[in-house]
């Protein structure tokens, strides 16, 4: 085979196309995580090709390359699948996607180890990572500073934080840190020689640091300033001094760069590090800890976190035991807590064992090299303790697996064993990319149809009927289809169909507690004339989504029911505020007034709220009022 078309070279080419083009794919969507986000589906298409090349290498060489770290990861992955067999895994099917993603990560690590990637191949891969980071960093800055209202990508120009393609600013921040990590790895291996390479490395460091700051993520800021002391001791000994100085200077300039647009913007600062997320995270961890204590051995069952969390949180809130009420929680923003609550002790001990072994393996090297390797993984590891980056972004998971594979290889080396089976790896090398690409491309069609359906009034059912593969968005597809049938049954007074909806939603409510699910059940009960059950469901929804929190079911129900209901809600809201001022109630009132077109009144309420609650900064920055309070010509 020509040296230009070896499997290792093809691996580099596929990865290059992914970083230059594939990962930046844009398609309108309704948000979410995992396969609900179009760019993730495209990343998995390329990932399947990379896995296929690794399996093809096994077939050609008839050898297996592995080390103890790979075996530990494989064993741990098998253990993490076992809770699916627990008797409480009623909703286990909804955990299969994350287990498949985990298994695919182990498979990509295995595939990388099979390929005989030279130092030059690895350096090319690192430069391709820099290219991807540079593209996303510049795109994020364009979003924040240059896009105007009504832009074709749908970016909210009133947002104070950039998100890049990821639709989630914190994920952007973690991704761009890979640019700093890859550049550090390159200068540590003296792989930055030409002027062009220096421009790429230093330019990426500057723009990546800038994008990291404007992502507004506290987690990213902590990771940024923690990774520098972890990387520096090894870089001091291995990197050329002038490159190390340039690397540090460009990072520092990138961190300072966000201040310049503010100075040129008449002192109007963007509140990038705003929000009250700390209290919410503390609440999620506290509730998760209590849930774990109640079911420590077998957990509550894979796929059950969403439903059990909201009921437990509401109970603690009623007792005044928590501060920082959260909503729509499908994940506790801490990976260890997530697996522990759903699966109990086995996943918890497995993850701790896996982390402990990997740290032990890398610290068998010199302490400077070990700290360097730990620093390369630290941003992602930290982010998994505060959010769910691997669910939001497949490319972050893929790059993390790349780094794990390379670090494990450097720390332990590789063993080689004969593997005479030639046909099976070759078959899987073809089947995995084939089925993955077909699945993901039909998934993109699903996202397009569901997004169009929901954005055009949820009335054209032919869009749902035209979906080829609903699996990437199965929950949303089923909800949209059943809601359409509910609305039709309500209009046509089809009692059997209404009862079918209630029967279907019984299971849904145990698994996924959402305001729209409560709303639909209330409508079904009312259509059947079951007013008592409708009222009970309404009261239960108020318990889960109280009036004085960011998401109030009373407000949402009034907003969806119609103008008269919303006006009645505003009267009730004002009466409550006379007795006791509350920021959330003020915000709901202002949003309701904006929906009714009473803008002047909404502005007066905002002014009154700011006077009564001067310490509530969120009252000064209400998104629904921004179009009416922004200075003319501001972006």
Each predicted region: which residue ranges?
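Transmembrane signal-anchor hairpin modules in multi-pass inner-membrane enzymes, especially those
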Residues: 1-82, 92-94, 107-123, 127, ...
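Alpha-helical transmembrane segments of multi-pass inner-membrane proteins
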Residues: 9-23, 42-55, 77, 81-86, ...
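Loop-to-helix entry and N-terminal half of a specific, functionally important transmembrane alpha helix
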Residues: 16-20, 204, 330-334, 362-386
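Short aromatic-rich membrane-water interface segments that cap or initiate transmembrane helices
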Residues: 31-34, 88-100, 158-172, 285, ...
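Membrane-interface catalytic loops of GT-C/OST-like multi-pass glycosylation enzymes that act
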Residues: 32-36, 92-97, 166-169, 215-219, ...
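Transmembrane alpha-helices of multi-pass inner-membrane enzymes
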Residues: 45-48, 228, 369-423
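Interfacial juxtamembrane loops and adjacent helix segments
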Residues: 148-161, 275-279, 290-294, 302-342
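Flexible juxtamembrane loops connecting transmembrane helices in multi-pass membrane enzymes
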Residues: 227-228, 250-293, 327, 447-460
């Amino acid at each position: 085979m020509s040296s230009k078309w070896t499997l290792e070279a093809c691996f580099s080419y596929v990865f290059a196309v992914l970083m230059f083009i594939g990962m930046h794919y844009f398609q309108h969507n309704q948000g979410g995580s995992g396969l609900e986000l179009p760019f993730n589906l495209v990343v998995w298409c390329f990932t399947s090709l990379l896995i296929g090349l690794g399996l093809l290498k096994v077939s050609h060489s008839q050898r297996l390359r592995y080390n103890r770290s790979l075996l530990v990861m494989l064993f741990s992955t098998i253990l993490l699948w076992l809770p699916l067999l627990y008797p409480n895994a009623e909703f286990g099917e909804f955990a299969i996607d994350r287990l498949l993603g985990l298994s695919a990560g182990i498979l990509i690590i295995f595939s990388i180890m099979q390929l005989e990637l030279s130092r030059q191949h690895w350096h090319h891969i690192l430069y391709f990572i820099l290219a991807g980071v540079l593209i996303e960093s510049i795109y994020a800055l364009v979003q924040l500073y240059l896009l105007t209202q009504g832009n074709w990508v749908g970016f909210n120009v009133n947002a104070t934080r950039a998100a890049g393609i990821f639709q989630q600013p914190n994920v952007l921040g973690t991704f761009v840190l890979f640019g700093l990590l890859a550049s550090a790895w390159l200068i540590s291996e003296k792989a930055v020689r030409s002027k062009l390479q220096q421009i790429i490395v230093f330019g990426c460091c500057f723009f990546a640091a800038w994008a990291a700051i404007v992502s507004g993520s506290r987690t990213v800021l902590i990771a940024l300033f923690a990774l520098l002391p972890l990387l520096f001791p090894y870089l001091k000994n291995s990197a050329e001094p002038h490159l190390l100085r340039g690397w540090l200077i460009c990072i520092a300039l990138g961190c300072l760069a966000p201040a310049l647009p503010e100075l040129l913007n008449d002192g109007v600062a963007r509140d990038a590090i705003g929000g009250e997320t700390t209290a919410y995270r503390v609440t999620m961890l506290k509730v998760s800890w209590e849930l774990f204590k109640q079911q420590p051995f077998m957990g509550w069952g894979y796929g059950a976190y969403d439903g059990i969390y909201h009921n437990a949180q509401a109970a603690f809130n009623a007792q005044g035991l928590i501060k920082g009420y959260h909503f729509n929680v499908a994940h506790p923003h801490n990976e260890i807590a997530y697996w522990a609550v759903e699966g109990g002790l086995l996943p918890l001990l497995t993850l701790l064992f896996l982390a402990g072994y990997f740290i032990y393996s890398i610290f068998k090297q010199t302490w400077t090299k070990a700290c360097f390797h730990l620093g390369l993984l630290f941003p992602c590891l930290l982010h998994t303790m505060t959010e769910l980056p691997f669910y939001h972004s497949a490319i972050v998971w893929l790059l993390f697996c790349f780094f794990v594979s390379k670090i494990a290889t450097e720390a332990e080396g590789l063993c080689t064993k004969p593997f005479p089976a030639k046909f099976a790896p070759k078959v899987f090398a073809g089947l995995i990319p084939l089925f993955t690409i077909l699945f993901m491309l039909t998934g993109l069609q699903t996202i397009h149809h569901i997004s169009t359906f929901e954005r055009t009034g949820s009335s054209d059912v032919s869009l749902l009927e035209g979906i080829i593969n609903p699996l990437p968005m199965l929950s949303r597809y089923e909800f949209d289809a059943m809601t359409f049938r509910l609305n039709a049954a309500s209009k046509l007074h089809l009692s059997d169909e209404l009862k079918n909806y209630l029967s279907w939603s019984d299971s849904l409510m145990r698994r996924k507690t959402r305001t729209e699910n409560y709303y639909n059940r209330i409508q079904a009960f009312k259509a059947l004339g079951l007013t008592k059950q409708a009222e009970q469901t309404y009261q239960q929804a108020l318990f889960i989504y109280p009036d004085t929190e960011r998401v109030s079911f009373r407000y949402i129900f009034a907003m969806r029911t119609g103008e008269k209901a919303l006006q009645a809600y505003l009267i009730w809201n004002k009466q409550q505020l006379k007795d006791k001022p509350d920021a959330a109630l003020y915000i709901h009132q202002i949003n309701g007034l904006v929906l009714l077109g009473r803008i002047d009144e909404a502005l007066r309420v905002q002014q009154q709220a700011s006077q009564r609650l001067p310490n509530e900064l969120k009252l000064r920055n209400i998104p629904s009022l921004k179009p009416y309070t922004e200075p003319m010509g501001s972006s």
